[in-house]
Amino acid sequence: MAFLRSFLGAKQIIRRESSSTPRGFMAVYVGENDQKKKRYVVPVSYLNQPLFQQLLSKSEEEFGYDHPMGGLTIPCHESLFFTVTSQIQ
């Protein structure tokens, strides 16, 4: 069951190299410390989810409102990001 939830959650997260972001989605950069950040596109509805808001709080603690990537940067390991986003459904 967890695999199915993870698979369905992965359909909502889009890894995009291009700078375009579809309507109703937002770009976030995910990665820890000096590791290269990867860009993902997630639904804006995630902003209302308590689990995602915990990631945003971690981002605010580390960066304040000045994000070095120019977009929203979430300072966590990719596996944690996928775990959190797979639980939002």
Curated annotation (Swiss-Prot):
GO cellular component: plasma membrane
Keyword Cell membrane: yes
Regulation: induction: By auxin. Induced by epi-brassinolide (epi-BL). Induced by cycloheximide.
Keywords: Auxin signaling pathway, Cell membrane, Developmental protein, Growth regulation, Membrane
Any one GO BP annotation for this protein: response to auxin
Location in the cell: Cell membrane
InterPro entries for this protein: SAUR_fam
Pfam families per UniProt: Auxin_inducible
UniProt main location, coarse: membrane
Membrane topology: Peripheral membrane protein
Residues forming coiled coils: none
Function field: Functions as a positive effector of cell expansion through modulation of auxin transport.
Similarity comment text for this entry: Belongs to the ARG7 family.
PANTHER family: SAUR-LIKE AUXIN-RESPONSIVE PROTEIN FAMILY-RELATED (PTHR31929)
Protein name: Auxin-responsive protein SAUR15
High-level lineage: Eukaryota, Viridiplantae, Streptophyta, Embryophyta, Tracheophyta
